[in-house]
From Swiss-Prot:
Residues in F-box domain copies: 109-155
Recorded coiled-coil stretches: none
Protein name: F-box/LRR-repeat protein 7
Role, per record: Substrate recognition component of a SCF (SKP1-CUL1-F-box protein) E3 ubiquitin-protein ligase complex which mediates the ubiquitination and subsequent proteasomal degradation of target proteins.
Polar residues: bias regions: 32-55
Superkingdom assignment: Eukaryota
A GO CC term attached to the entry: SCF ubiquitin ligase complex
Cited SUPFAM superfamilies: F-box domain, RNI-like
Length: 489
């Protein structure tokens, strides 16, 4: 994947006449010792993949040298250590002068040639990238089929050294040949971990992929609000956005202004339902206010380690996004019981809540959630040191459909709280009590005797006897026990 109109670029290392020959050499031949900090041939096989629709091109690691055959460049000049995408011309007698493409008169075509195009496409959807590259070298028909846009609903690029901006530009340009300037079939772009991605790469996606529904740029710390604005403005069908680890992203809106007061909506909304802003450290209450006002259809929101958020930001969220089903504010140190009181206004719609390591939360806030969010299925309260047996009792009696509970590192939770949990939460499947200093084997036995469907129990760093662990194993036969007792196995 990489050049356009016959112009192709390569990288340092061996030159080759086609992308598939590079790939073949990486899988069929013994690789030589690579220089320090250089990507290996194995990396080239893994550096670009599609989730379910592999492509006949590859994001190649650094190589060198170039070759020109009859005026058509098949590799390019050196670009230092950067990795680029290559898109090669279909095999012809010009690009392969040593190979006779004309079959002998007495040789008939292979039986596979009688298959119709739609059968080939169905087969190609199941091939990995390197095999599809080899298929693209067979003949012009196979090359054209391998680049059929229907095989490109998903674009996935990985690699720290990948020149992802150029790869996206070349890919979208190649896929736009049948529909000038737009790739109508591309619905998913996944470039998480490509640290060299910049706003320029997202501009390319925004301009070329108007039907985009899912975008993942986790860990791409060079992405800013400007690029996100371009994507949400030009891709009206976007539903899933992952910008976790993008520390420069502080707002998602249809205007370039962070303040909601300076950005009138005029009836326009963003259709995002899933938003992950984990580790967006610069996000503040004002930014969350703007996000909530523009993304009113949110159902899944993850704000882990957004350390500047307070209870006020949660108030805005509940006002504009009443349909939130999953919410995580783990490690948000300024969130308190007042914030949980606002979250409780989501009532029966809330299914998943993570408040791990929110040290200001106590039984009071948990009581609000237990009273109004009776359909809660998952609660992570690990490290909430203010939580006691009273909070667990309210939770157990009100949230009867609770399936997963993490109360590890809650030193005030004891066997009394576990007894209330066991007598009410019969649907419990996952329970973590890691580092709960007040838990003993008596509480575990009560849980095991009542929660028969328990599938995972974490009692690491707990003062639990060997007999109690064996009791759990006898009564909960499908339960996986995570423990630190060397005598139990």
């Amino acid at each position: 994947m990489g050049a356009n109109n016959g112009k192709q670029s390569g990288s340092e290392g061996k030159g080759s006449s086609s992308i598939s020959s590079d790939l073949s050499s990486s899988t069929d031949q013994t690789s030589t010792k690579a220089p320090k900090n250089a990507a290996t041939s194995e990396d080239s096989d893994l550096s670009m993949r599609t989730v379910s629709t592999p492509s006949p091109a590859l994001i190649l690691p650094p190589r060198s040298s170039s070759a020109v055959l009859n005026g058509s460049s098949t590799s390019s000049s050196t670009f230092g250590t950067e990795t680029i995408a290559m898109v090669h011309m279909p095999p012809t007698s010009l690009t392969h002068p040593q190979r006779c493409l004309r079959q002998p008169r007495d040789q008939q075509g292979a039986p596979v040639d009688i298959l119709p195009d739609h059968a080939f496409l169905q087969i190609f959807t199941h091939l990995p990238t390197n095999q599809l590259c080899r298929c693209a070298r067979v003949c012009r028909r196979w090359y054209n089929l391998a680049w059929d846009p229907r095989l490109w609903r998903t674009i996935r690029l990985t690699g720290d050294v990948l020149h992802v901006d150029r790869a996206l530009r070349v890919l979208t340009r190649r896929l736009c040949q049948d529909t000038p300037n737009v790739c109508l079939t591309v619905e998913t772009v996944m470039v998480s971990g490509c640290r060299r991605l910049t706003d320029r790469g997202l501009y390319t996606v925004a301009q070329s992929c108007p039907e985009l529904r899912r975008l993942e740029v986790a860990g791409c710390y060079n992405v800013s609000n400007e690029a996100v604005f371009e994507v949400v403005s030009r891709c009206p069908n976007l539903e899933h956005l992952d910008v976790s680890g993008c520390s420069k992203v502080t707002c998602i809106s249809l205007t370039r202004d962070v303040s909601v007061k300076l950005s009138p909506l005029h009836g326009q909304q963003i259709s995002i339902r899933f938003l992950d802003m984990t580790d967006c450290f610069a996000l503040e209450d004002e930014g969350l206010h703007t996000i909530a006002a523009h993304c009113t259809q949110l159902t899944h929101l993850y704000l882990r380690r957004c350390v500047r958020l307070t209870d006020e930001g949660l108030r805005f969220l509940v006002i504009y996004c009443p349909g939130v089903r999953e919410l995580s504010v783990s490690d948000c140190r300024f969130i308190s019981d007042f914030g949980l009181r606002e979250i409780a206004k989501l009532e029966g719609r809330l299914r998943y809540l993570s408040i791990a390591h929110c040290s200001r939360i106590t039984d009071v806030g948990v009581r609000y959630v237990a009273k109004y969010c009776s359909r809660l299925r998952y609660l992570n309260a690990r490290g909430c040191e203010g939580l006691t047996d009273h909070g667990i009792e309210h939770l157990a009696k009100s949230c009867l459909k609770l399936k997963s509970l993490d109360i590890g590192k809650c030193p005030l939770v004891s066997d009394a709280g576990l007894e209330q949990l066991a007598l009410n939460s019969f649907n419990l499947k996952r329970l973590s009590l890691k580092s709960c200093e007040s838990i003993t084997g008596r509480g575990l036995q009560v849980v095991a005797a009542n929660c028969f469907d328990l599938q995972l129990l974490n009692v690491q760093d707990c003062d639990v006897s060997l007999e109690a662990l064996r009791f759990v194993k006898r009564h909960c036969k499908r339960c996986i026990i995570e423990h630190t007792n060397p005598a139990f196995f």
